[in-house]
Regions:
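Extracellular or lumenal secretory-pathway regions
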Residues: 17-136, 142-145, 152, 197-281
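A generic structural signal for short beta-strands and their flanking turns/coil linkers
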Residues: 101-103, 163, 184-188
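Extended beta-strand-rich segments in extracellular/periplasmic secretory proteins, especially
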Residues: 128-170, 176-178
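Short, solvent-exposed secondary-structure boundary/capping segments
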Residues: 176-181, 213-217
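A recognition module on extended beta-rich or small alphabeta surfaces enriched in W/G with H and D/E
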Residues: 184-190, 196-199
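Sec-dependent N-terminal signal peptides
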Residues: 1-13
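Extended serine/threonine-enriched, polar tracts that run as long, contiguous segments within proteins
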Residues: 166, 174, 191-196
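Short beta-strand segments that buttress and anchor functional surface loops
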Residues: 31-33, 154-159, 190-193
């Protein structure tokens, strides 16, 4: 409860410091998210709490844990709190309350700018940004129906970014949106998962009042480093797996050449045990 209250207070503070308010939110969906960190042995399931905040002209999707982490570490008072919580976690050997990044560093902004999806990510210790055309997903409707959070839902399937997705959309909520980059159905997606169940999003709460506005976050107030989707994803995989010299990684090389950051730690080469969410790069 204390974490939730603190998060709400920081939400208002961050919006006041570095932000672009896009539009008032009309509905917000909270999803329980699971991903397999080891898709071979399936022994490491990571969980997260994701937020989809929807307005009339744009929406945003992000990890609540990552937002909490970024809010703390990019605020002078919050940094002191984060350091105290981190030290306490090590002292107690209990890291459950330590500020941490969730399953992803990504913040997604749909239809911002119009007809585009913008992603920001600070995994390379510099706030990177790329945008892409709003995905056109070829969904195939099925006859299966079920109820989620009291809403009648219909099933649809599609191949998207190298995965076979199943989505359940609410037929009584005519909002063409959903978790992550999924959307394009005649109703709000309340559950989605890929064929191997490596990634799953399940709605656990729908909120329609007292909402924060849909807001484009810039936590440190510095300009974003712009790139493109495939360059970012290729570089991310190479960085995480320690492939080759860190300064030969495409995006890191560009960041260093720009002067935004000078040094990166060389990671030990290893095989990633999980498949990234997107496979088409």
């Amino acid at each position: 409860m204390k974490t939730t209250v603190f998060l709400l207070l920081f939400s208002a503070q961050v919006v006041a410091q570095h932000h672009t308010r896009l539009n008032p939110a009309t509905i917000e969906v909270h999803y329980h998210h699971t991903m397999q960190r080891d898709t071979v042995r399936r022994l490491a399931t990571e969980t997260d709490s994701m937020i989809l905040r929807i307005g009339a002209s744009a929406s945003q999707f992000f990890s609540r844990h990552t937002f909490y982490y970024d809010s703390l570490w990019n605020d002078p008072d919050g940094r002191a709190t984060a350091e105290a919580l981190t030290l306490e976690a090590f002292r107690m050997r209990n890291h459950s309350k330590e500020p941490r990044v969730g399953t992803t560093y990504d913040y997604l902004y749909k239809n911002y700018p119009a007809g585009r999806v913008t992603t920001t990510n600070e995994q390379f210790h510099v706030a990177c940004r790329y945008d892409e055309a709003t995905p056109s997903i070829s969904w195939v409707m099925a006859d299966s129906i079920r109820t989620i959070l009291g809403h009648p839902c219909r099933m649809a399937t599609a191949d998207f970014r190298g995965r076979r997705w199943t989505a359940w959309f609410a037929t009584d909520i005519p909002v063409s949106d959903g978790p992550w980059k999924l959307g394009g159905l005649p109703g709000l997606i309340l559950e989605a998962y890929d064929r191997g169940d490596d990634y799953r999003y399940t709605a656990v709460r729908i909120v329609e009042s007292g909402l924060q506005p849909v807001t484009f976050y810039c936590f440190d107030g510095k300009p974003f480093f712009d790139t493109d989707r495939r360059t970012f994803l290729r570089s991310q995989r190479a960085f995480l797996s320690g492939q080759g010299n860190v300064y030969d990684i495409e995006l890191i090389r560009a960041i260093v050449q720009s002067g935004r950051r000078k040094t990166y730690m060389q990671r030990e080469a290893h095989r990633l045990l999980f498949d990234p969410l997107e496979r088409d790069y």
